[in-house]
Amino acid sequence: DQVKIARPMKGTPAEEAGLKEGDVILRVDGETVRSSDVAASLIRGPADTQVSLTIRRGQDTFELSVTRKSISIPAVEHRMEDGDVGLIALMSFNEHSFQETSEALNDLKTRGAKAIVLDLRYNGGGYVDQCLAIAELFVPKGTVVSQRFKSSPEKVNYTSGEGLDIPLVVLVNGGSASASEILAGAIQDREVAPLVGTTTFGKGLVQGAYTLDDGSVVKVTVSESLTPNGRAINGVGLEPDVFVEGDEAQLAKAVELAKAAVLNPVS
């Protein structure tokens, strides 16, 4: 397992420190990390303090000092594409993601969107409860994800509504992980919409990180996520229905498919 940078957001400490897409985080303050959950828990800290990262970039390994700061990043951006297709870029599952996604969807419909492209590329996950709430907007009544625990019964999460009433296309890539894969997996298995892009990251384990008195960190796997059809995500990822490489080409294909679905709706 490794912690790979998807794409540093503009204005964040990661970008300002010089981190690049594809960089691998080996250690945080000397502590070896092999999961994004553990890395994130070690990287977080008070603003204006320093955290040391050991980075592998290609064949090179080097140390990088990052200055922490308070940042506010919108979870969602949205706009119209090619006249009548609404694009919702869901960048993370934070505490505001459901509200922002719902507002974006309503705004795009008001502006005349006849189809939606949901962009989950570079979304590394976040709060699963927000993912499940967002699934209500897109996935009709039925299973979203099953969570398999080591020492307790399997838990199945459902949607209860009617889902989206206009065509949907979903963008994914290798930066789509964890909660993004839960949502994309439900959309794919339930045949709500095609996935366009490249294979997703393959993070299907929900993990907790606990710091001990001596400062060491213990990583505990809490559960494993399975798609509605019982597919394991971890270590495998989701294969897109339409394989396309390159950010711009992926978006163009998604918009093309969305517009085609408007012209030729499936009954």
Language-model features, listed with the residues they occupy:
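Cleft-lining beta-strand/loop regions that shape enzyme active-site pockets
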Residues: 6-7, 15-17, 29-32, 37-203, ...
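Short acidic, Pro/Gly- and aromatic-enriched capping/linker segments at domain boundaries
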Residues: 219-224
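Conserved catalytic motifs of ABC-family nucleotide-binding domains
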Residues: 22
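Short beta-strand-turn/beta-hairpin segments enriched in glycine/proline and small hydrophobics
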Residues: 1-5
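Short, acidic, Ser/Thr-enriched surface-loop or helix-capping motifs
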Residues: 227
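Conserved functional hotspot residues or short segments at active or partner-binding sites
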Residues: 233, 249-267
